[in-house]
Amino acid sequence: MDLKFSNFFKEAEHPALVKKFDKSTTDESSSKEDYSTMSDLWKMFSKAKSELSNGRRVENLTWRLMSINLQKNLTPNGDSNTLTPDTFSDPTAPSSAQSVPPTSSAETTADNSDTEMKLNPIPAYSVPADTTGSSLMEFNYIQRRVRKTSFDESTAKSKKRSIADSHFPDPNAMQRPHDLESQPFSYPKIHASNSFNFVKRDIDSSNFSNLDASALPISPPSDFFSVHSHNLPNAPPSIPANSNNSASPNQRIKASPKHADTDVLGLDFDMTPSEPSSFPENGGFPSFVDANTHEQTLFPSSATNSFSFEHGSAGFPIPGSVPSTSYHANTASEDGFSSSYNSQGLFGISSPLSSGVTPNQSFFPDVSGNNIFDVSRNNHEVSSPLIQSPGSYVSMPSINMVSSLPISAPVPNSNSQFPRRPNTFRTNSSKSVGQGSSGVDSNQENAESFNPSISSHNSAEWASGETTGHSSNSPLPGSDMFSPQFMRVGTAMGVAPVRSNSSNNFGQNFFHQTSPQFSAVPHRKVSAQDTNLMGSSPGMYNHMPYLNRATSANSITSPGVLPEGMAASLKKRTTNTAATPQAALPTTLDTKKDRSVSFNINKNAEKPTVSNAAEDKKGDANTRRANATNPTPTCTNCQTRTTPLWRRSPDGQPLCNACGLFMKINGVVRPLSLKTDVIKKRNRGVGTSATPKQSGGRKGSTRKSSSKSSSAKSTAADMKPKADSKSISPGFVGGNQSLSSERIPLDPSMRSPLQQQSSENESKSQSMLSANNLNAGVNDFGLGFSEGLGSAHLDSNDSSMVQGKNDFAPVVDSPLFDAFDTDLGMSSVAESHTMNMDPSDLSRVSKSWDWYSVM
């Protein structure tokens, strides 16, 4: 400060300014007087701030000067962090050891005695150390006003306590008298050793008077997500035991706040969204309390703190967060409960966000070589998450990095004295996640190595819903109480129903859907040959649009398990989903070759023998199967591969633009004899939609009927269609268009184009008879009307044709009826008795709404 400015303050009227910059007054008595004068100066400006232009700024300046002067006075006492006195406090407050000596009346004059600020005593507990990071606040140095109540402010660091404050006991709780008014907050009775098994038995509220502060586990709020080892018997050497933050097991039995018996209901705590709720012990909800965890090793992870509940003296569970991160083999958390469950997620019906699982987490981690599950197992029975056994509780971790789903949740001990609660995941308990079970994201492909307790389920047993000891296989949550036919489960694409169908591996797949984190987890792409995952679980993954097509198509590989009416809808959904039916449908029913039915009409249809060698090769079964995987679609009626627009038949098969429009307009299948007429009339040219590349009979775009007809006559005699004595193929083979249409009933030995798995050992005499009947039914291109869907003639006015249709009208169990009339309760598409009908005669089942799906 320069000399001019110093002289200005020395010449000021107020003596406080003069003394402030007078270097002669530096002794201790003058410093005390400086404080008094600065207080008077601040009071003067605070009263006159309304009259001054910058009154607020001047008042703030004097306030700061007064506080600086006070801090200088308190520095020799070693209490530089003590706050400034409150000018509004009561002078008659009780004294304390840390109070600053008040200014004596001898050192003050009579003029300022009425306005002198007497320093009030500051209780030790009323001004706690600042741990909230508010030291940068402007008025942090101001002393908090001493309240006239006996409220202990050391228990409340702020108005809204943090999560750590609400979960850890006060280390000074035993040092203060047990006063109800001084203990407004009730702390959860938490013990860092997870030794709830003997704490619940031995703790007694009457012994609280014998406790001291050393018995309490002290955990600062900053250690909320850190790992503490608490002198457990089997604590690994890699985690050092912190003796400062732990107590011996004998001390920990008694370690509970002295005011524990005052919190009767256990409800006066801060519930955050990540905490589970507390429920009565014998109610319909579980009390998630860990048990038998003091005899196992710690779980070496810093992110798996488990919320636990301890029963107080009144018998009500009180929530808390245990800082110990022990992971034990004899608790239910070893059996896969390592994900973030809340009280709603345990019941299998939870929103995708309730568990906090990120999409990059695998909900079935690879357990081989994973230290997470490498824990020593003792021959103890593990209590189920919702069935309580004596002295046994379930540890539900709230924060972890490994999300897994339970495969087996063991049943409780037989001597359980508590009422049985509905088990969430009630399956056989012969195997657990830690013993090498596998899931969707595991690399084990053997179905039996997945989990024998699940893969060997008796479907009738789990469907009955009986819970008989170790054989209780009810997959639905609490299925002994309720078992809905459909459940609404949140998926990644929204809410979709889950069908409760019985199958061998159904319990495994149900866990993948009803768990909270299932909906947010992307799935590994399952091939159609993964029968251990998908083959025996019909309809499980059909409501999930994010699965691949082969998975949804493979869901009907076990037709015997499908209920009535469901197989048809599943088949229709699978057929409409597949973009190329030749690629998707042949693998759909590949596992059951004796019952296989493919809707690819031209897949196994026999071709006429022509001079082209490629056509002979296409007639081979292996080549046809390889051709089925060709991504290029083929018209199921005229066999063409080039068309300006692809359409679909009512059963979902691809049709060219001409055949699709003809079927949509006329309601019947377009005859192959009309193919050249349509092309000739419109003068399409080479490479049009009606070019039958597979027939090989037509070389150009224009029709030369004489040569084509003669070639067709010569090749028709060599055609030998496959025969099947079980097949009944009602239909009509029309003659050439120039001839009158006559009704020729097909021989029963003729093979329908849709029934593609034909037997090779039929007699050739029947084949020759069928070939003779087809001689009159060869079109201009050498292609018989049995090829494709050409059995229906265009001439709908022919009475003989209509009469023939009526002859076969009573036969109705056709796959086409299953694909549309699912309300009729038809049987499954893939069952053997549904293959006795030729569905190519679409006019027999046509309705007014059938052809809306052609587009």
Curated annotation (Swiss-Prot):
Stretches with biased composition (Polar residues): 72-112, 445-476
Superkingdom of this protein's organism: Eukaryota
Subcellular location: Nucleus
Main location: nucleus
Keyword Zinc assigned: yes
GO terms for MF: cis-regulatory region sequence-specific DNA binding; DNA-binding transcription activator activity, RNA polymerase II-specific; DNA-binding transcription factor activity, RNA polymerase II-specific; DNA-binding transcription repressor activity, RNA polymerase II-specific; RNA polymerase II cis-regulatory region sequence-specific DNA binding; zinc ion binding
Pfam families: GATA, GATA_AreA
Residues where Phosphoserine is found: 150, 727, 729
Keyword Metal-binding: yes
Zn finger region (GATA-type): 635-659
SUPFAM superfamilies (alphabetical): Glucocorticoid receptor-like (DNA-binding domain)
Region (Disordered): 72-126, 149-184, 229-287, 412-483, 602-643, 680-768
Gene Ontology cellular-component terms listed: cell division site; cytoplasm; cytosol; nucleus
Biological processes, Gene Ontology terms: negative regulation of induction of conjugation with cellular fusion; negative regulation of transcription by RNA polymerase II; positive regulation of transcription by RNA polymerase II
Biased composition (Low complexity): 240-250, 428-444, 625-643, 707-717, 755-767
CDD domains reported for this sequence: ZnF_GATA
Biased composition (Basic and acidic residues): 149-168, 614-623
Keyword line: Activator, DNA-binding, Metal-binding, Nucleus, Phosphoprotein, Transcription, Transcription regulation, Zinc, Zinc-finger
Biological role: Transcriptional activator.
Protein name: Transcription factor gaf1
Lineage: Eukaryota, Fungi, Dikarya, Ascomycota, Taphrinomycotina
Gene encoding the protein: gaf1
